[in-house]
């Protein structure tokens, strides 16, 4: 066992700076951040000051950081989807172990390339499929593995993206276009697909899918809608997607309600009423949701046939009040429902009373962010990798399913065989 290790952070956005860095700092001297890369000067300078880094430890891009000698034992790659593999390959070749943000890549060829380089270099890659690391889903796994419902025959699951999250990230935000990021099912739900395969202990054989961007387009703009929410929009009062409501006044998401975290921290490095208002006035997050250049889906369904003949139905939709997940597992001896919003896991053995297990939610993907970093720290310090560790090889099946589903969707729902 090692006493400590060093890490380089590539990408200081919502995941790198706001999710993972605070978790690493909880480990004190066991984890030291020795290099950072971030193109936004304000973010880079702020983190450099926090960590006491010298100028030669700070870079504008991951490419600049990786061009020189190795600066840490491990690297966290938390950049945009299409940057992951072009940065991860040279990082592995330089000798870094990796904590890699999802998705690995929208290209299966790149996924396979990265897996090959990881094998050739003998380096470790952990993919940020954070849901496996929550106490909630670990309990679901314990019950299912213990035979609580018998053999799982059918899984039904839904990701409630949330109306404001859909508009924030996938209509106005960085993940609104497939050509700039990846298909929405891959970017948003690859860790859901990974989760349910792991929970049920299954592998996929065949996939079909339907979905589209049916609503967030010009055809659905209400009468009197303006190009920007602050440009005298006549539909503003009745529009739930109004940027002022989401970022200023909404009780759950608005800065005026005291929410200076996500999503407001995406609009301004130090969110306050004036800085958020200015971002709405001048930036992409103030655009009308019916006048953006988005092309990713706003809803999608996926049907999966497993290799053992069991089935999995998954729905992703942006048309929900809450941002949460719900699943049901139907087995030969009972059924189990998992409601992440309430924290309740309800087990109903056939012919017997139901049992309810309550798991209190935690911050950061219900505690998944903290659990992921803990598992990575333990791995880097020399501990044994846990059975739920989301290694690269394990994680790629979810990517194959997501990309097969996108292929099916674009082909009108035709079934796609998985190799």
Predicted regions located by residue number:
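C-terminal capping/lid region of NAD(P)-dependent oxidoreductase domains
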Residues: 2, 123, 150-154, 407-419
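N-terminal Rossmann-like dinucleotide-binding module
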Residues: 1-53
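Short, Asp-centered acidic motifs that coordinate Mg2+ and/or phosphate
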Residues: 35, 74, 154
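Rossmann-fold dehydrogenase core element
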Residues: 113-130, 150-157
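C-terminal helical cap and adjacent loop that interface with cofactors, partners, or active-site loops
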Residues: 51, 295-419
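Beta-loop-alpha module in the N-terminal Rossmann-like domain of NAD(P)-dependent dehydrogenases
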Residues: 53-117
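Glycine-centered short loops/turns at secondary-structure junctions
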Residues: 95, 122, 147, 309, ...
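Predominantly a Rossmann-like dinucleotide-binding segment in NAD(P)-dependent oxidoreductases
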Residues: 131-285, 412
């Amino acid at each position: 066992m090692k006493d400590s290790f060093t890490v380089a952070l590539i990408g200081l956005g919502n995941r790198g700076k706001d999710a993972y860095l605070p978790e690493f700092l909880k480990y004190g001297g066991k984890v030291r951040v020795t290099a950072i890369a971030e193109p936004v000067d304000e973010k880079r300078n702020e983190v450099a000051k926090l960590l006491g880094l010298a100028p030669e430890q700070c870079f504008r891009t991951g490419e600049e950081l990786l061009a020189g000698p190795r600066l840490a034992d491990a690297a966290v790659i938390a950049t945009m989807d299409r940057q992951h593999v072009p940065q991860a390959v040279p990082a592995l070749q330089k000798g870094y172990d990796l904590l890699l943000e999802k998705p690995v890549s929208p290209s299966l060829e790149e996924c396979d390339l990265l897996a090959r380089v990881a094998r050739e270099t003998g380096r470790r890659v952990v993919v940020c499929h954070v849901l496996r690391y929550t106490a909630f889903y670990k309990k679901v796994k314990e019950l299912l593995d213990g035979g609580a419902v018998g053999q799982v025959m059918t899984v039904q699951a839904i990701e409630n993206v949330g109306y404001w999250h859909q508009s924030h990230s996938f209509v106005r935000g960085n993940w609104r276009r497939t050509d700039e990021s990846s298909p929405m099912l891959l970017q948003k739900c690859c860790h859901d697909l990974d989760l349910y395969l792991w929970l049920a202990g299954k592998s996929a054989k065949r996939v079909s899918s339907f979905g589209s961007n049916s609503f967030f387009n010009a055809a659905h703009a209400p009468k009197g809608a303006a190009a920007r929410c602050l440009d005298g929009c006549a539909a503003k009062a009745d529009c739930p997607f109004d940027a002022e409501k989401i970022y200023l006044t909404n009780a759950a998401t608005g800065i005026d309600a005291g929410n200076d975290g996500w999503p407001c921290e995406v609009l301004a490095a130090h969110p306050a009423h004036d800085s958020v208002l200015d971002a709405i006035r001048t930036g992409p997050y103030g655009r009308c949701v019916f006048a953006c250049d988005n092309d990713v889906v706003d809803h999608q369904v996926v049907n999966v046939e497993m290799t053992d003949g069991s089935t999995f139905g998954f729905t992703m939709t942006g048309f929900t009040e809450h941002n949460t997940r719900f699943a049901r597992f139907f087995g030969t001896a009972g059924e189990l429902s998992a409601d992440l919003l309430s924290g309740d896991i309800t087990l109903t053995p056939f012919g017997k009373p139901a049992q309810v297990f309550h798991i209190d939610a935690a911050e950061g993907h219900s505690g998944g962010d903290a659990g992921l970093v803990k598992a990575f720290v333990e791995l880097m310090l020399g501990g044994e990798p846990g059975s739920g560790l989301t290694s690269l090889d394990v994680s790629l099946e979810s990517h194959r399913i997501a990309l097969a589903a996108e292929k099916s969707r674009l082909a009108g729902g035709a079934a796609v065989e998985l190799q």
